């Protein structure tokens, strides 16, 4: 089974379990929090991701983590399932897909906005309001930074790409100039 199918299957199972009790938001919040603890702590991450560490020791670690964070039974059982099946390494990917499912269930479109520098909160709000107005839909904006675009922004959602960057403009100009045949 390829990795994307595997991630999709685990995510759908988790999402459906959360839907039964109508706690999708809570499950997302808890599993994201647990993932942050794991990714922020190198020792925990290496311990849980290591194929050498005994499965029972990993389960004890999850039990301890669950006790300290008071996580929901669904999240707890899901983490145990990942441990038992040696799948903890795909937790971040599962969370990403879970977020997409959560947004789809609320009719919220996920939009990625790439800028050359970190945008100020007012700029982020302005961009969000204009995108929501253009799409006539609520959005969740993921702001990323890529200094290669030089300036401006690039907006991505679904299969759409709107390039308002300086690099994009320069690339278009370069493409046009290459097409122009200059004979002297």
Swiss-Prot record:
Entry's family note: Belongs to the ATPase delta chain family.
Function statement: F(1)F(0) ATP synthase produces ATP from ADP in the presence of a proton or sodium gradient. F-type ATPases consist of two structural domains, F(1) containing the extramembraneous catalytic core and F(0) containing the membrane proton channel, linked together by a central stalk and a peripheral stalk. During catalysis, ATP synthesis in the catalytic domain of F(1) is coupled via a rotary mechanism of the central stalk subunits to proton translocation.
One term under GO cellular component: plasma membrane
SUPFAM superfamilies: N-terminal domain of the delta subunit of the F1F0-ATP synthase
Natural source organism: Rickettsia canadensis (strain McKiel)
InterPro entries linked: ATP_synth_OSCP/delta_N_sf (IPR026015), ATPase_OSCP/dsu (IPR000711)
Membrane topology category: Peripheral membrane protein
Places the protein is found: Cell inner membrane
Name recorded for this polypeptide: ATP synthase subunit delta
Alphabetical UniProt keywords: ATP synthesis, Cell inner membrane, Cell membrane, CF(1), Hydrogen ion transport, Ion transport, Membrane, Transport
Designated gene of the protein: atpH
Assembly behavior: F-type ATPases have 2 components, F(1) - the catalytic core - and F(0) - the membrane proton channel. F(1) has five subunits: alpha(3), beta(3), gamma(1), delta(1), epsilon(1). F(0) has three main subunits: a(1), b(2) and c(10-14). The alpha and beta chains form an alternating ring which encloses part of the gamma chain. F(1) is attached to F(0) by a central stalk formed by the gamma and epsilon chains, while a peripheral stalk is formed by the delta and b chains.
Sample GO molecular function, one term: proton-transporting ATP synthase activity, rotational mechanism
Chief site of localization: membrane
């Amino acid at each position: 089974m390829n990795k994307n199918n595997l991630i999709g299957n685990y995510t759908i199972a988790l999402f459906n379990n959360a839907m039964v009790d109508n706690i999708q938001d809570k499950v997302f919040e808890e599993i994201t929090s647990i993932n942050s603890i794991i990714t922020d702590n190198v020792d925990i991450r290496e311990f849980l991701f290591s194929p050498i560490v005994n499965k029972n020791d990993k389960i004890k670690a999850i039990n301890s983590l669950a006790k300290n964070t008071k996580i929901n039974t669904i999240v707890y059982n899901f983490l145990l399932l990942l441990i038992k099946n040696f799948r903890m390494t795909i937790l971040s990917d599962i969370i990403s897909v879970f977020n997409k499912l959560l947004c789809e269930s609320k009719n919220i479109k996920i939009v990625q906005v790439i800028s050359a520098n970190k945008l100020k909160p007012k700029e982020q709000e302005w961009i969000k309001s204009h995108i929501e107005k253009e799409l006539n839909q609520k959005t969740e904006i993921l702001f990323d930074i890529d200094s290669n675009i030089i300036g401006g922004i690039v907006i991505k959602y679904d299969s759409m790409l709107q390039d308002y960057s300086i690099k994009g403009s320069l690339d278009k100009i370069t493409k046009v100039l290459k097409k122009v045949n200059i004979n002297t």
